[in-house]
């Protein structure tokens, strides 16, 4: 029986990506429909805000960094959390594996063979596509080991270029910060399959160390530094810039209230976001700013939420901020130590929900199912960082988000040279 093309389209566009990936490989006609730009645009318009994602930790180096997973969302239709699907099959026996970065559905790995050979891989774990990144020319295993032990070297940079929701290229970034306002970037491009070196001015390079993790967004890497009032950024797809941007937090300066928690950054709805608590006792408020311009002036930030935390404080005040929801900017995530659970707080309605690791998995505010993976243990190791007695220390990125793509993005690969 021949099925009309219009009916085929209507059926396929309502299926989750997990099913589309399977049907795409079963039938040539279905593959042609699914691969069309029109189908992709229709699918993404129907699934604009329901994507599986994870909260990942930034300290221990394990293959699965996920501490909180969101699955059962409409777009992918996963029955397990995204972190449980990440696996890597090495081409040789290995003795060490580290997850260096996760962004836009791609993962950057550092691997050591049983004889100590260093290897870097970029992959799409959902499709089990992995590509080994060649080392820089003339670099030996000893060179890489020496660099990785340098206190101002970092090999954890991964940025992407997106078009219509699809990753079309990526760059792996190594950096070494010098003491005199200079940073060297070594950049591997999936477009060229080659490395390039950039020497960039960075006035705060003396306060930049290898343990500082970055957040990638729109081709830009963002780093917190030992200077608590600001952070650094560099655009790897935005042209030939010879200097890093320095962005000061919006509550920095003597004219502002002292925030309760140490400053950090997160992402939501395509923007860098900063939120913190202000006030005290019965007047606790959360303020949320969105970064709108990469400059060092007050016009860099837009205050877009200010909400009372009176309802949350009924659980006690022993909590601290974790991340914002990456797709819904009205939802923030807080960890409650006394309740040993994740608090999801809606800034618009002031409604909150408490989710505990000891409870059965259940739906949360975005319609996804919440699952935990040693979250309580991790939060216990980092909670002291948020204590007022630590306010004089550096800012650190302790949690980030890993969001699955909204479409079937394959892993970009360098074109073979003629």
UniProtKB/Swiss-Prot annotation:
Species for this entry: Arabidopsis thaliana (Mouse-ear cress)
Pfam families linked: b-prop_At3g26010-like, F-box
PANTHER family reported in the protein's UniProt record: BNACNNG10540D PROTEIN (PTHR31672), F-BOX DOMAIN-CONTAINING PROTEIN (PTHR31672:SF9)
Domain called F-box: residue spans: 1-42
Name by which UniProt lists this protein: Putative F-box protein At3g23950
Classification via PROSITE patterns: FBOX (PS50181)
Matching SMART domains: FBOX
